[in-house]
UniProtKB/Swiss-Prot annotation:
SUPFAM superfamilies: Aspartate/ornithine carbamoyltransferase. The keyword Transferase applies. The gene is pyrB. One of its GO terms (molecular function) is aspartate carbamoyltransferase activity. InterPro entries: Asp/Orn_carbamoyltranf_P-bd, Asp/Orn_carbamoylTrfase, Asp/Orn_carbamoylTrfase_sf, Asp_carbamoyltransf, Asp_carbamoyltransf_Asp/Orn-bd. The lineage of its organism: Bacteria, Bacillati, Bacillota, Clostridia, Eubacteriales. It comes from Pelotomaculum thermopropionicum (strain DSM 13744 / JCM 10971 / SI). Disulfide bonds: none annotated. Pfam families: OTCace, OTCace_N. This is Aspartate carbamoyltransferase catalytic subunit. The keyword Transferase applies.
């Protein structure tokens, strides 16, 4: 078992001390990335398997880079190209992974709870890279790391999360993570995309984007999934941009020097204007860079911290 437990399934039940350990461990990992030779032998002899049942560029590449910078061997299983497409179940895939002798498995799956199911089946450390609309813990951890790096703290900050909360696993993990670390989380978006029960998670649901943005220290903009328009969950892209899009004028409501983030990929001109995405307050590119450092920390703590049997 690693220094933060066997697996990373979500942030819902993760204590603040464990989150802090991950963020603190990511600091020296970022120093490694800044070196001319971005490689250390920390996880030499370890095998990390990535299994993605949904398309991903950023997350998969980030985990693969993290593993390679730590000298781990990586195996990528693209679900469409594997026996999954022939009807193989998740448990069958788990047995195959176990036979490979993997030390860690990074899983993305459209079904909520898939990572937890896999964790019960294999001895390897399982990292949830997104399971349905449930959680995406490594994204939230890199968001926390980025904000702490920019602001010097997390406790007492006002964090506004804007957009499609209902279908966003990032939003759920961010809510758990930021509230656990003492931040105030505000939510805003179309009423049809704000599910019930958000207050029970410790967040405040605002009646407008403007209310959520008022004096906010951090603004997290969520990608609007275009297929939701076809389902009638919001009126149209132009209308969404007018009512909920984060532009320069709306951003003035936030605190001076507010940090703007987006988990990607972005719909420029819809949920976020190009001026904001590319502006001085944007930390979107830093999120990508920090994502590798945080995932290096996770792989180290779960498989290379000297506590695995």
């Amino acid at each position: 078992m690693g220094l933060i437990g066997k697996d990373l399934i979500g942030l819902r039940d993760m204590p603040a001390e464990r989150i802090k350990l991950i963020l603190d461990t990511a600091v020296p990992m970022k120093e490694i990335i800044r070196r001319q030779i971005k490689k250390v032998p920390t996880l030499r002899g370890r095998t990390v398997v990535t299994v993605f049942y949904e398309a991903s560029t950023r997350t998969r590449t980030s985990f693969e880079l993290a593993a390679k910078y730590l000298s781990a061997d990586t195996v990528t299983i693209a679900a469409a190209a594997s026996s999954v497409s022939k009807g193989e179940s998740l448990k069958d895939t788990a047995r195959t992974i176990a036979a490979m002798g993997a030390d860690a498995v990074v899983l993305r799956h459209p079904m909520a709870g898939a990572a937890e199911l896999l964790a019960r089946t294999v001895d390897a450390a399982v990292i949830n890279a997104g399971d349905g609309a449930h959680e995406h813990p490594s994204q939230a951890l890199l968001d926390l790391f980025t904000v702490r790096e920019k602001k010097g703290r997390l406790e007492g900050l006002k964090v506004a999360i804007i957009g499609d909360i209902m279908h966003s696993r990032v939003a759920r993990s961010d809510i758990w993570g930021f509230t656990r670390m003492g931040a105030e989380v505000r939510l805003a978006g179309p009423a049809t995309l704000l599910p019930p029960g958000l207050e029970k998670m410790g967040a405040r649901v605002c009646s407008s984007v403007e209310e959520a943005l008022m004096d906010a220290d951090v603004v997290i903009v969520l990608r609007i999934q275009l297929e939701r328009q076809q389902q009638g969950l919001f009126p149209g892209l132009r209308e969404y941009a007018r009512l909920f899009g984060i532009n320069r004028e709306r951003l003035r409501l936030a605190a001076p020097g507010a940090v703007v983030m987006h988990p990607g990929p972005m719909n420029r001109g819809i949920e976020i204007s190009p001026e904001v995405a590319d502006g001085l307050q944007s930390a979107i590119n830093e999120q990508v860079n920090n994502g590798v450092a945080v995932r290096m920390a996770l792989l180290y703590l779960l498989t290379g911290g000297g506590c695995r049997k």
